[in-house]
Amino acid sequence: IEDNRVINRAPLLNASLTQPATGVFSGVFTNSYGGNVSPDFTGNIRIDQKTFTAQLSGAAHNIHANYYAGPGGIAPVETNGHPDDVWGFAVMGGLQLKELPTGPGDKLSLDITYVDGAVKYLIGGVTGSSFDAFSGGTNFAGSYNGMAVLSLLDGVYTTGSHIEKTKGWGFRGGFLHNW
C-alpha cells in the first residue's frame, strides 16, 4: 500500500475550467483531483540469482476527480456533479544480467514500463504539474534558443465527460563496467 497524497501523484486536468490559454502548455493549471479516497496498491515478484535478477511489478491507482466546471468555465461546485472514479495502473518488468564476460562486477540492466492513468510510475518523482527546460544556446547548427515543456497528467476531463487516462511507456537500460 502506498500513500496517494498530492505530492505523490501527477495532476488531473479539468479542461473546462477558465484558465490562461498558456496554462496547459506551460504546466501552470489547477490540479482537479477531488481528494484522496484510496491508497495506491503496489506489488512485485523478484527472482535474485548469482547470474541475474528479474522483477515484475505492478500498481493500481485511483483517479478521483473534482466537480465539473460551471457555465463559462467558472469554479466547480458540488451541484455540477463529477465524473466517476477510474482506476489507473502500471506494469513494470526489469532484468539485470550479472557475471558478464566483460569483467568482474559488470552488470547490464534493462527495464520497461507501461502506464495507463498512473504516470508517476513512469516518471518517478512527479511532484508538480510539469517539466520545463530552457536553453540559452546550443551547439547545433541553425538553432538559436530552445525550450521544452511537458505536462505530466494522470488524466483529463471536461464538463459532462468521463476521465480520459494518460497512457505512456518507457524503456531504460544501463551498463556498469568496473575498470
Which stretches of residues belong to each language-model region?
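Aromatic- and glycine-enriched pocket-lining scaffold segments that form the walls
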Residues: I1-F89
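Detector for outer-membrane/organellar transmembrane beta-barrel domains
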Residues: K50-W179
